[in-house]
Design a protein with these regions (language model features):
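Active-site nucleotide/adenylate-binding loops and adjacent lid/helix of ATP-dependent enzymes
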Residues: 1-26, 32-184
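Conserved strand-to-helix beginnings and helix N-cap segments that scaffold or border functional pockets
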Residues: 18, 217-220
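Acidic-residue sensor for enzyme active/binding pockets
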Residues: 147, 206, 231
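Conserved metal-phosphate-binding beta-hairpin within the catalytic cores
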Residues: 152, 158, 187-217
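Single conserved hydrophobic/aromatic residue that forms the stacking wall/gate
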Residues: 228-237
C-alpha cells in the first residue's frame, strides 16, 4: 500500500485532510507519493490510497472501474431523520414555487451545487447555472442548531466530532447507537451526520461513505484507516 497525497504548488499539503493522512502514514511507516494534479497519478493500484479534493478521489476510483454511489438516506435509517425526504428533479422543483420551502441537494452530481434551502426566487442562484436537469433530494426544513459527525468502522463508533453550530449541544448517545445498530446494510467504514434541532431532537442529517470525507479533527491513524478501508470496497458498476 502507498498513499498518493495531493500538495499545493508551494509544496505544502493541499488541505488539512491531506496532512492528517500524511501524519497517519508517518506513524504507520506507509510510503507516500506527493502529487500536484491527479492526472499525473498513473500507476496507483487498487490497494493504494489517493487523497486530495473530492474530484481527485473520484477520478482515481473511476480509473479502477469503481462506480461512486452516494449513500445519503438508507431505508433502515429513514426513521432517524424525523422529516419527510423524497427524490425529485431540479427543474421540477425550481419551476413550481408551490414546491419550495424545502432543502434541496443533488443525488449524484454533488459538484453542481451545495445542499441549500429554497425559499424564494433569490435562492435559485445558489442552485448553479447548468442547463441539464438532475435528480435531487428534497427534505422538509429542520432548524439544526448543531451538527456532529459520527465515525463508524466495522460496526463500532470510533469517533464523534462537532463540525457546525453550537458547541454546547450534544447528540443523544442512545440515538446514535440505535442508528448504528439499525443500519444492517452499512459498508465497513462510513459516517453518520446528526444534528440537534431547536426542539432538542437528535436527528439524522445524512449518511456518507468514508472515502472522501473531511477529517474534522479525528485521530490521524483512525482517519487513515477509515478512508483506506472504504476505497477498495466501493461497489463496482
Amino acid at each position: 500500500m502507498r498513499a498518493f497525497i495531493r500538495i499545493q504548488h508551494s509544496g505544502d499539503f493541499y488541505d488539512q485532510n491531506c496532512y492528517s493522512v500524511y501524519h497517519g502514514c508517518s506513524k504507520l511507516d506507509i510510503p507516500i507519493v506527493r502529487y500536484k494534479a491527479i492526472y499525473s497519478v498513473t500507476d496507483n493500484a487498487p490497494t493504494d490510497l489517493v487523497v486530495g479534493a473530492f474530484s481527485d478521489v473520484k477520478v482515481a476510483l473511476e480509473r479502477l472501474g469503481v462506480n461512486l454511489l452516494p449513500i445519503d438516506y438508507p431505508d433502515e435509517l429513514l426513521p432517524f431523520t424525523g422529516r419527510k425526504i423524497w427524490k425529485s428533479t431540479l427543474f421540477t422543483i425550481t419551476s413550481h414555487p408551490d414546491y419550495w420551502h424545502v432543502f434541496v441537494k443533488p443525488v449524484e452530481d454533488v459538484k453542481r451545487f451545495r445542499g441549500t434551502i429554497l425559499d424564494k426566487s433569490e435562492d435559485l442562484i445558489k442552485l448553479g447555472g447548468g442547463l441539464e436537469d438532475i435528480e435531487v433530494w428534497c427534505s422538509e426544513k429542520v432548524n439544526f442548531l448543531a451538527e456532529w459527525r459520527i465515525w463508524i468502522l466495522d460496526g463500532k463508533i470510533i469517533g464523534v466530532n462537532p463540525y457546525r453550530g453550537r458547541w454546547d449541544l450534544y447528540p443523544d448517545p442512545k440515538v446514535l447507537q440505535q442508528a448504528v445498530n439499525a443500519y444492517h446494510s452499512a459498508p465497513r467504514a462510513y459516517a453518520l451526520d446528526f444534528g440537534i434541532t431547536d426542539k432538542r431532537e437528535t436527528l439524522l442529517v445524512e449518511v456518507s461513505d468514508a472515502y472522501a470525507l473531511s477529517s474534522f479533527g479525528l485521530d490521524s491513524v483512525l482517519y487513515l484507516s477509515l478512508i483506506h478501508i472504504s476505497e477498495p470496497t466501493r461497489r463496482r458498476g
